[in-house]
Amino acid sequence: MSKKPEHTQPVPVVAEGATLGVIGAGVMGQTLLRGLLSGKLIAHDRVWAGDKNPSTCDAASEALGIAVESDYQARVPSADLILLCVKPNDAPAVMAALRNAGLRRETLLISILAGVGTDRLESLLGTENPVVRAMPNTPAVVGEGMTVICRGRYATKADLQRAQAIFEAVGRCIPVDEVHFNAVTALSGSGPGYQFLIMEALADAGVRVGLPRQLALTLVAQTALGSARMVLSTGRHPAALRDDVTTPAGCTIGGLLMLEDGRIRSVLARAVEEATKISAHLGVGPTKISESGGGQRSGD
């Protein structure tokens, strides 16, 4: 399995003299900005952010040392690249605001709006701006994020490379076909939630057999971290790595038997399946999810 990609030459994030804008200065917006600034991919005076919540603007500006404003429209024409980090339901209003603010045709838009495809974004914008869609996850906060990206009909490979450079500032980034985005959202986008629940349950189990809670949490978290690194660094299948620690009549095989009795594989598979169905409807507002749900054609 390949390691985290490294560019031999830095990929320019914005053109000379232009700026990078971030609309939505919440957790993920601030995380991406922090990664770009700390990685020196862009200077503080070349970045601005906007958020409809004044208190969020104040907090983000203080944390990052950049301009963060509720009324950001005047800055839009100077932007060479804009990151969209708002909620999916805010997409129509934000796209209209960008268009009315004088968005330049060549400005690249990178969206992390879950469930909103590139076709939908392009339709809302009503222009031929290049659009890249991304799905990061929350471990980006500690520089260990997993992001997938794809490009819309007007975006180029160079646009995709610029997006990849941004998300590699906070972890790993892989280009994929857009048809996989609902499944990716369910697996890696929601994945930290599954992992935290599993870690919590294992820590509780440690307490049940007599361990102090903090010790149990540390043992579980470090074991999860080390196991993940073994998979990524060795390229070996998890089943082969599991066999290495499973000795005849030992503790591990006994514990695994109980997990299999509890149908852990099918429970996890059903969780991802259900989350995939929900992802398909995130960009269209509240709706009843059909039994046949899930799956989205490329660009929906």
Where are these regions (language model features)?
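NAD(P)-dependent Rossmann-like dehydrogenase/reductase catalytic/cofactor-binding core
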Residues: 2-8, 12-14, 221-300
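Rossmann-like NAD(P)(H) cofactor-binding subdomain of soluble oxidoreductases
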Residues: 48, 54-55, 64, 72-149, ...
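NAD(P)+-binding Rossmann beta1-loop-alpha1 motif at the extreme N-terminus of oxidoreductases
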Residues: 2-70, 77, 207-208, 298
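Short pre-catalytic strand/loop immediately N-terminal to key active-site residues, enriched for Gly-Thr
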Residues: 132, 181-186, 238-243
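Short acidic-hydrophobic, aromatic-tinged amphipathic segments that line or gate anion-handling sites
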Residues: 67-72, 174-176
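Internal alpha-helical scaffold of NAD(P)-dependent oxidoreductase catalytic cores
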Residues: 48, 120-130, 146-184, 196-233, ...
